[in-house]
Amino acid sequence: FPASPNIKPQLADQWAFGYFRNFMDNSVETSAEIYYKKLDNLIDFKDFASLLLNDEMEADVRAGKGHSYGLELYTRISKEKLDGWISYTYSRSQLRTASEEMAEKINDGNWYASNFDQPHNAVLVGNYEWSKRFSTSLNTNYSTGRPITLPVAKFNYGGSERVYFSDRNGYRIPDYFRIDLSVNIEGNHKVRKLAHSSWSLGVYNLLGRRNPYSV
């Protein structure tokens, strides 16, 4: 949402501390960083907000504050035949509405996970050269499933069926995990040639895991 007379500009203050060091003639690169971010005037949709054909969308959002913090680790290796890196991130992102009136609060005014709250994220990327023409590449990704709000019960009220939902973002979709593998073949390296060719045969999602994106 853009800032308007009814919606204040969003503000953020961030602090970070990092340590970086290389080893073995710079063939190994490492880093570690921690951070904390304080956010103000964040907005989120109220419960049962109307999102379609709504000319007064600003009336269905609530302002609040938030914070996020985390740790990032990274290592890269670059040697004669092996080149790759591995990273791991632990992070949390939470929100809370600032309204004084209980009816205006989301999640009863308690902290809740933002839509971007994914505590664990890990990536492994590597390439190994078996020869000047043949190499193998690996790409592995893992992340915690993002948070969602689910209906947990239903009841009858006034002759109609009603749905009771969980706390805001009280559940998560299944974790995401994927491995990609490829074999790369370079053309010959003759100096006098009009063009250079290369072939790559890859398998996306090697384990065939069904990774949900949205529920």
What are these regions (language model features)?
Residues 1, 42-51, 56, 91, ...:
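Outer-membrane beta-barrel translocator domains and adjoining extracellular loop/strand segments
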Residues 12, 23-26, 78-82, 91, ...:
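Outer-membrane beta-barrel channels and translocator barrels
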Residues 39-40, 133, 141-160, 174-180, ...:
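C-terminal beta-signal and adjacent terminal beta-strands/loops
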Residues 1-31, 36-38, 50-79, 115-119, ...:
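Outer-membrane beta-barrel signature, preferentially recognizing the C-terminal barrel domain
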Residues 15, 71, 124, 181, ...:
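Residue-level detector of short, conserved catalytic/binding motifs and their immediate flanks
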Residues 3-5, 110-113, 166-172, 188:
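Active-site rim elements
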Residues 35-38, 57-150:
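Gram-negative outer-membrane beta-barrel transporters
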Residues 18-20, 31-35, 87-89, 139-141, ...:
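Transmembrane beta-strands of outer-membrane beta-barrel proteins
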